[in-house]
Amino acid sequence: MSQHVSRLGGLRGRSHGHGAFGGPYHQRLRRVGRRPRRIAMLSVHTSPLHQPGTGDAGGMNVYIVELAKRLAAIDIEVEIFTRATTGTLPPTVELAPGVLVRHVDAGPYEGLAKEDLPAQLCAFTHGVMGAWAGHRPGYYDLVHSHYWLSGHVGWLAAERWRVPLVHAMHTMAKVKNAALAEGDTPEPAARVIGEEQIVGAADRLIANTEEEADELVRHYGADPELVAVVHPGVNLERFRPADGRAAARARLGLPPDALIPLFAGRIQPLKAPDILLHAVAHLLDEDPRLRERIVVPVVGGPSGSGLAKPERLHKLAARLGVSDVIRFRPPCTQDELADWYRAASVLVMPSYNESFGLVAIEAQACGTPVIAAEVGGLPVAVRDGHSGILVPGHNPADYARELHRLSADPGLLKRLGSGAAHHAERFGWDKAAAATADVYAEAMRGYRRLRSVHG
């Protein structure tokens, strides 16, 4: 019997027969014991203050910021430890009332790739321990780490502070390596081993979806009793239809009657923006008349240090003969991104893997349907035929066909847009924070019980 916290109707279970969880699990997670007063949240490789869509900043940054704010709103103080990336950063920044960001010096400030960060975990851990040393015992009630790098720091911190560790993978090496894009680099064995160690050390694991929970059990041997599913949320105050598509297009200088398939996110093979470019080329070959009324914005920057430009994508657009309809735009603020969502006819997400797909929920909250690959958590984020269209595989011709279908059927596009806004209303950060707080309470109760048994 395994427990899954789900914002979509409380706790959900599925029958797996002899699969990962061995049967249905409908028991409601009991709210027992106290919630933490203050937690240490760890995000080694990317700061919640960074602009999403740049470098390694993306959905995880949004996740941490929104979750921390909502936890603070229910009286759980959050201190976020992250690596300092410039020498001008103050030691601490108040992100919101009850949310403090602590910058930790670990390695050179600039030009350090994520792949080089394992060598800096000792320095980062030293900084975290140094910040804690000035506090009384019991200052933090729990550690919540994000991504495998943070998990290793959290493992040591939780043991030193004698508090439970809650960990969120966000992405997993074994899953990514099983669905690599052409030309993408496999995740190293060191990461796989590191993730296996964290799974064994954590008191609770939070998965974005039931599928991710299954993957934790199937690929990493996680104890099903320690895995909780909490769907991420969306900021429904920021991401909403607002004054509509026409007004958003006017603000962005886009044609009022254009077909606008949008890509928004980091420019990396995993996100597959090249699939969209190939699909657009295929679409224009099939229906050359569309060239006069199609605009394809690609909003985002390259992964890593952010110093490189997405030159390969520019060259691909030129080679495919679609440079005239592609509009490359740099990463933008969350408020500006909301306008891009509203202006778009449809968001296209041909990713090879997504643990959830926050971008899909954000777009739908703005009333924009989504064409997405049927991978990872996207079948949860997108309701096929109601809020968008799920495409099996990554054949550009399949995406071109769906784009053509939407361009030829304004009624369908409108129905999907209405369904998208309705679907997104089910995903709010307040619910996600409440469910996460319940996981914390369970972790603390289990930790206290274990200590009472073992002394």
Curated annotation (Swiss-Prot):
Transmembrane parts of this sequence: none
Record protein name field: D-inositol 3-phosphate glycosyltransferase
GO molecular function, one term: acetylglucosaminyltransferase activity
Binding site for UDP-N-acetyl-alpha-D-glucosamine: Q51, P52, G59, R266, K271, E354, E362
Chain positions covered by the region annotation Disordered: 1-25
Record note on quaternary structure: Homodimer.
Enzyme class, spelled out: transferase
Organism of derivation: Streptomyces bingchenggensis (strain BCW-1)
